[in-house]
Amino acid sequence: MRSMTHVASRFRISRVALLGCLIGLSATCPVFAQLNPATPPASLQIEPAEFTLIGPRAEQQLLVTVDSGLNSVRDATADVTYESDNPQVVRITDGRAQSVGDGTATITARAGSVSATARVTVQSFQTPARVPFHTEVLAALTKSGCNMGACHGSPSGKGGFRLSLRGYDPELDLVTLRGEFFNRRANVLQPDESLLLRKPLMEVAHGGGRRLSEGDASHLALREWIAEGMQTEPEGTPTLDRIELLPSPRVLRDGAERQQLVVKGYFSDGTVRDVTALTAFDTSDETIASITRNGVVEREGRGEATILARYLDRMSTTQLTFLTERPDFQWPSPPEIN
């Protein structure tokens, strides 16, 4: 509750600041500099500029921004072309860097005549990596909405299946997933026959509707965890400290219709991992901005929206302001009263 109150407060403050710019400044205010979508990009930025992928399952969502000058930025993650100078170490698929083998590589993103690079190190690729229960399975259940209060996270559960609210009791969830319903809930011998997968995929009637898409991050995490025997992590496994949501607050003008989000998880052993694919997103105003399951914000209208990212029990926010040019607008030049 306190976190959501803080988000609402920041949302109100940002609106006041924007209104102040409208009232107190002239048409030269930089927030309202006109964007010409045809203007060639002046510079390109890729985030994170340097990162490490640990293990054969590691990935990193990239964020590429075009800065056309005049305070005009837009997301170009899905528009640029990518190249890895060492495909035996890392490859790029749909804007995601995926580990292929140990070593280092440079990723180059290009848009027209400009480019930006990121340095990647891949470690422990040959080391088997089990799906962690606490940081991936619980996150997958939360992202899919299975453990929300209106679903199986309610005190009495749904359809005889009960999970802790948003994964706040991992031990209860582990017992439930391993042993309930005569092991039909999760079938380690035939993972694809598990009700935990078939129901949210709508292969079997499910009152909660479709919650998973075959092949998405949540589905793969749950399936692989079941196939591996539904293990939990050993003692001393690094825990999550905090998350960071990118980009930082920004203003998007005409021509900027979407914004890729990236969520970085900071763990107790000092490692930083991409957790975007298993993060749940929300928006303060769906008439201004909507969010896809892949973490892409799409413009719905004009105004400001606060974007909330929730991974396990950690949250982070950013603000996106969508501006639209109004050619018919004329400053009324009110008379001075002081």
Describe the residue ranges of each PLM region:
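Bacterial N-terminal signal peptides
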Residues: 16-30
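A composition/secondary-structure signal for short, hydrophobic, low-basic-content segments
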Residues: 2, 30-33
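Aromatic- and Gly/Pro-enriched helix-to-coil junctions and flexible linker segments
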Residues: 32-338
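Alpha-helical and His/Cys-centered functional microenvironments
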Residues: 10, 22-23, 64
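N-terminal secretory signal peptides that target proteins for export/translocation
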Residues: 1-13
